[in-house]
Amino acid sequence: MARSFTNVKVLSALVADGFSNTTTRHGFAAAAAATQSATRGGASIGGNMVPKSGEEKVRGGEKVSWVPDPVTGYYRPENTNEIDVADMRATVLGKKFNQ
């Protein structure tokens, strides 16, 4: 009797797994079809627009090169000036909080 229960358990797991795979594949097919229809002209972005890289967004025509910061080791733009943390806090918070 115990063998039959394990066989039924295995069979039901296979059936349930097959059903799950079928629904997953159907969902993927529907998503792929929606993507293809959108790129054909449904919700497409203008063809003449070219996205700008990060450097072009920052300064317009000026090129920005990124160099490692000698103190922290993180990369930062080369032409940025160093600012003191206390000065930045005073600028951002204003006189109300800096009394």
UniProtKB/Swiss-Prot annotation:
Q: What protein name does the entry list?
A: Indole-3-acetic acid-induced protein ARG2
The record's region (Disordered) falls at 40-62
Q: Which domain of life is it from?
A: Eukaryota
Q: Supply the Pfam families for this chain.
A: LEA_3a (PF03242)
Which UniProt keywords are given for this protein, alphabetically ordered? Stress response
Q: Which GO terms describe its cellular component?
A: mitochondrion
Q: Where is the composition biased (Basic and acidic residues)?
A: 53-62
The record, for InterPro entries, names:
LEA_3a
Tell whether Zinc is among the UniProt keywords: no
The answer to whether keyword Nucleotidyltransferase applies is no
Instruction: Tell me what organism the protein belongs to.
Output: Vigna radiata var. radiata
Describe what upregulates or represses it: By auxin, heat, ethylene and wounding.
Biological-process GO terms, alphabetical: response to stress
